[in-house]
Swiss-Prot record:
Organism the protein comes from: Chaetomium thermophilum (strain DSM 1495 / CBS 144.50 / IMI 039719) (Thermochaetoides thermophila)
GO cellular component: nucleoplasm; PeBoW complex; preribosome, large subunit precursor
Free-text function comment from the UniProt entry: Component of the NOP7 complex, which is required for maturation of the 25S and 5.8S ribosomal RNAs and formation of the 60S ribosome.
Domain of life: Eukaryota
Subunit structure: Component of the NOP7 complex, composed of ERB1, NOP7 and YTM1. The complex is held together by ERB1, which interacts with NOP7 via its N-terminal domain and with YTM1 via a high-affinity interaction between the seven-bladed beta-propeller domains of the 2 proteins. The NOP7 complex associates with the 66S pre-ribosome. Interacts (via UBL domain) with MDN1 (via VWFA/MIDAS domain).
Keyword Nucleus: yes
Gene this protein is translated from: YTM1
Family: Belongs to the WD repeat WDR12/YTM1 family.
Positions of region (Ubiquitin-like (UBL) domain): 15-97
Principal cellular location given in the protein's record: nucleus
GO biological process: maturation of 5.8S rRNA from tricistronic rRNA transcript (SSU-rRNA, 5.8S rRNA, LSU-rRNA); maturation of LSU-rRNA from tricistronic rRNA transcript (SSU-rRNA, 5.8S rRNA, LSU-rRNA)
Alphabetical list of PANTHER family matching this protein: RIBOSOME BIOGENESIS PROTEIN WDR12, WD40 REPEAT PROTEIN 12, 37
Annotated protein name in UniProt: Ribosome biogenesis protein YTM1
Pfam families: NLE, WD40
Length: 495
């Protein structure tokens, strides 16, 4: 009697894919773009195929894959099933370099809410401005610095290990007399801050031994009649932009010699007694703005320099508008009217054009991407959705033109990849594309308390400021901490 035959193994299901990319240096030859792959393959397996010797032979570049504008986050078979497609369907996979997931690194403790944060490194704007002006002023590895501003009215300089190197003096010694709302490095030895005392202040920063430093006020700038809630700087020209609750955009010089005299009626001694004038132990030069333009009908919430043309600025306001401003003439060049109050603004450079793409954070929990060119056919290019409260801070990636991070009152920072976009649904207005976050950064202070669920509105853990540097993502907020998240190895759980 013949032995029973064993069942033959079932054939492995396969799917035909076509690999495409928009990155010329990673393009496959035409003959290698179509391939049959296992239906149960995921992102990691596809990435290994592309890195193999017979394909790109790139070794270890981690890739993500877009199908119809959305990242593949399952097996190809599961994607086909969830979209009602058969295994006979040919899938076009656009491969892109993966973003590195941000991993919690550390927190820097403060006495009060952290309103602003900035980073000084070899690749940060201030670091590049410093090295361009003087090669000996270049920031060396291990000498990076973090700047924080707090509602206690103080600035602090930290090293990368979380030790305070310098603290600004109090109001009676030349510092701010109310909460600070914004602060940035101008260069490696100079910085600017602004706040609820309606002033902009310029500081000289010195270090003697890399362990201790000093912040000395060198200039007080007067002109705004409301809280100064936003600040941007250009270290090359030593110019400062501000946005204020008084609806005005301010344009200032950080150089005492080139700044005009201030309006005497706005100086702190204009309406106080002689006895009170004598309370400050420090005498600091006082100057006015190069330009102060009341161009908004509601509080101005943001003002930024054009990343390529520093004679152009963009401003945002609770009056729903983004305005393009010619800083040489003080004239508004164009006005874009959106549908919600705007609370933050950032610019992403674009290849092939001198005009940036603007990201505007709104009170309606989303981010609107807009083209500021007056000739643009549509105002809104894309909408980034995912936050559950106001979006009050934005920072572009230091390494590419397609990603940014946002900070929100919902208690999170979210990382966005503009290469991933889907059509808007009817409920979303059916206009333009929609992108969703690729990573969500929670406040570690909330998680460390053993809380299983963060309040949807972010009560107790609101984020007020975020900046993205090659060192990592630094954010500050209501939990009285600067939180540091760094990128490490690419996520591998999707193998």
């Amino acid at each position: 009697m013949d032995a029973p035959m064993e069942d033959a193994p079932a054939p492995v299901a396969q799917v035909k894919v076509i690999f495409t990319t928009t990155e010329p240096d990673l393009e496959l030859p035409e003959s290698k773009r179509q391939l049959l792959v296992p239906a149960d393959i995921r992102r990691y397996g596809l990435s290994r195929i592309l890195n193999s010797e017979s394909m790109l032979d790139t070794g270890s570049i981690p890739f993500d894959f877009l199908i119809n504008g959305s990242f593949l986050r399952s097996s190809l078979e599961d994607y086909l099933t969830s979209n009602g497609l058969s295994l006979e369907t040919t899938l076009t996979l656009q491969y892109v370099r993966s973003l590195i997931p941000p991993v919690y690194e550390a927190s820097f403790e403060h006495d009060d809410w952290v309103s602003a944060v900035d980073v000084l490194s070899a690749t940060s704007p201030a670091g590049r401005w410093s090295s361009a002006a003087n090669s000996s002023a270049a920031v060396q590895p291990g000498q990076e610095r973090v700047l924080s501003a707090s509602y206690d009215g103080l600035l602090r300089i930290w090293n990368a290990s979380g030790s305070v190197i310098a603290t600004s003096p109090s109001g009676s010694h030349g510092g701010h007399t109310a909460s600070i709302k914004a602060a940035k490095f101008l260069t490696s030895d100079r910085l600017a801050s602004a706040g609820m005392d309606r002033t902009v202040r310029v500081w000289k920063y010195t270090e003697s031994d890399h362990f201790t430093g000093e912040l000395k006020p060198t200039l007080e700038l007067y002109g705004h009649t409301g809280s100064v809630d936003w600040l941007d700087v250009d270290g090359h020209s030593k110019h400062i932009l501000t946005a204020s609750a008084d609806g005005a955009i301010g344009f200032w010089s950080a150089s005492k010699a080139s700044a005009p005299e201030p309006d005497a009626s706005l100086l702190p001694g204009a309406h106080v007694s002689k006895r009170r004038k004598a309370t400050s132990s420090v005498s600091t030069a006082q100057r006015g703005p190069l330009g102060l333009w009341s161009i908004h009908t509601a509080p101005a919430t943001a003002a930024i320099f054009d990343p390529r043309d520093r004679t152009v600025a963009y401003s945002a306001s609770q009056d729903h508008t983004v305005r393009t401003l010619d800083l040489t003439t003080g004239q508004v060049v164009s006005t874009l009217t959106l549908t919600h109050p705007l609370l933050s603004l950032s610019a992403l450079t674009r290849a092939g054009t001198t005009s940036p793409l603007l990201a505007a954070g709104t009170s309606a929990r989303h981010i609107t991407m807009v083209d500021p060119r007056a000739s643009s056919a549509t105002t809104s290019v894309m909408t980034l959705r995912g936050h559950a409260n106001k979006v009050v801070s934005l920072s572009p990636s230091p390494e590419n033109e397609y990603s940014l991070v946002s900070g929100s009152h919902d208690g999170t920072c979210r990382v966005w990849d503009l290469r991933s976009v889907r059509p808007a649904t009817k409920e979303e207005g059916s206009l333009g594309g929609v992108s969703e976050p690729v990573y969500v950064i929670e406040r570690e202070s909330w998680a460390s308390k053993g809380k299983k669920k963060r309040p949807v509105a972010g009560d107790g853990c609101k984020v007020f400021s975020v900046v993205w540097d090659k060192l990592g993502i630094f954010s500050g907020g209501e939990d009285k901490k600067v939180q540091v998240n760094r990128g490490r190895n690419i996520v591998t759980e999707q193998k």
